Amino acid sequence: MVSQLSQKHLSKGDIIYPDSDGKPMADNTKQFELIVEIKKGLDLLYINDPEVFIAGDLFWYPVQGQSKIVTAPDVMVAIGRPKGDRGSYKQWEENNIAPQVVFEILSPANGRIEMSRKLLFFERYGVEEYYLYDPEENVLDVWQRTFEGLTPVEATDNWQSPRLGIRFDITSGRLQLYSADGKKFYSYIEVNLMLDQANQQLDQANQQLTEMEVMLQKYRDRFGELPT
């Protein structure tokens, strides 16, 4: 959420920029699963690009010296910034590059009023694309930066992100993302099911290989080596 944090000072007068407000990343399992699905899907999409930083629920401080000006998008993407661990995203330490794309998943604790505050924050501090999804109503709201600022997009059916190239689909009753080449962003459960299936197929292949080796040995015992 957009946090109004108490500004503390070190003995030398240096401003402290907290890495957390002690609040959980998500209020419920549905919100958490969507956040993880989006974040991990983007990680995979940009796995070979060292200059794309992706984070979930990370404090973003856009203004140096102003620790009260902070928000933590559910997921944010900063193109042009290196991968790596950060306690928070201090924009003045990131070549003054603001996250270009942010995602928010609506939850009971983050209602429309809170989201309106976040919209103003993203508008003011340079976000190019803002995606807000309501999992209860299955509604996707999209804002894109124009010369007038962050402007709502009217037709969001099968919307494709200009920055990321990913496609948004809500026709199945929930938000589903696809990469530009049509690959689906999988949930944690789906990934585990596919892993289990792959392991079963591997076990079956190993069993067939063992059976073939047994048959081959029986042939050798009876007839000798196979002719070359």
Predicted regions and their residues:
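C-terminal interaction segment
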Residues: 2-27, 41-44, 60-73, 78-101, ...
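A structural signal for short, well-ordered beta-strand segments and their strand-loop junctions
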Residues: 53-55, 131-134
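A structured, charge-rich N-terminal accessory region that forms the first stable segment of a protein
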Residues: 27, 32-45, 53
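A short acidic/basic microdomain associated with nuclease active sites
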Residues: 48-60
